[in-house]
Amino acid sequence: MPATWGDRFQCRHQPRHQCQCHPQMAAALSRPARSKWACRQCETLTQAPVPAQVIDKGIPTAGLLAHVMVAKFADHLPLYRQEKIFGRAGLAIARSTLARWVGQTGVRLQPLVDALREAVLKQGVIHADETPVQMLAPGEKKTHRAYVWAYSSTPFSALNAVVYDFSPSRAGEHARNFLGDWNGKLVCDDFAGYKAGFEQGITEIGCMAHARRKFFDLHVANKSQLAEQALHSIGGLYEIERQARDMSNEDRWRIRQELAVPISKTLHEWMLAQRDLVPNGSATAKALDYSLKRWVALTRYLDDGAVPIDNNQVENQIRPWALGRSNWLFAGSLRSGKRAAAIMSLIQSARMNGHDPYAYLKDVLTRLPTQRASEIGRLLPHQWVPA
């Protein structure tokens, strides 16, 4: 008959080396013990299994991996700097090792990012923007311009999420591949890469902030009275948005119809009249033309309380990439760029939901190895509850 635990005695204590990170930014070598037990009757040895890890049989704990990811993608510390910081703490961790950990962690987190993408594409209105990132060309020592595309929920949505998509170029096919058969309302700038989607059923929503910026730059350049008048009228539209920010979509639509529609109609008529008075090719004509050519898209927000007035929501989520590229300079490959986009998607979405990125990632990386695929959604930033 099989022996019970009462018939066994501990015969050996086997330490298992792991590298962990303490809150004080000190890394240390921990030795979680795995005891061996022997049966007094049959002398059979039994040992506790190794706890499941994100990196199978790897030495970094979930806390250390979370620290490396947050330091690189939230605090913008390139890996060579982290290597030096760990060195001062008494740990010799090569940047090549850190890079391998980043890649392996990104792979393990990809199912979460795929689920996050599905959640974003269930929204009827989403934001889109893109920004350049240098990428090392395969087999060469020089870089070329790649792009990160950002797709986020709106400030009026119950979902707080952003998903980044790293691509080798700014070709519109990358946006089409990400959006798939989604055909909602897309808030974006006037980039031609989105045009094919508009022809296939996506509704274009213009960005009033871009229109305003044209007049702002004109006013800064020559103190234009025309620009000042345009800024005053657009400012009136934004004041209404501030009043309606915390309203329901239906109430926001009502106040827009009552207050914003008359302002927008007056502004449009004024712009048309002013355009007849200025010469083609002038800075003033260009500022007016930007708004007049996009007026339908710029004012669609007036007819739907769920649609924002501008694209600032996603532009704020693009900013971390601008900060990051000034520190880590470039992506080492297309694959590493995609891994970075995956990790950044979760970190920024965690921030949007008010979570500490380190606490979120540490918990997710701890639970992920044993999480059922059918319950992966519980680890998404907008549904996450600490264990």
Regions inferred by a protein language model and the residue ranges of each:
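Catalytic center-proximal scaffold of phosphoryl-transfer enzymes
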Residues: 32-387
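Residue-centric detector for conserved, function-critical "anchor" positions
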Residues: 1-35, 40
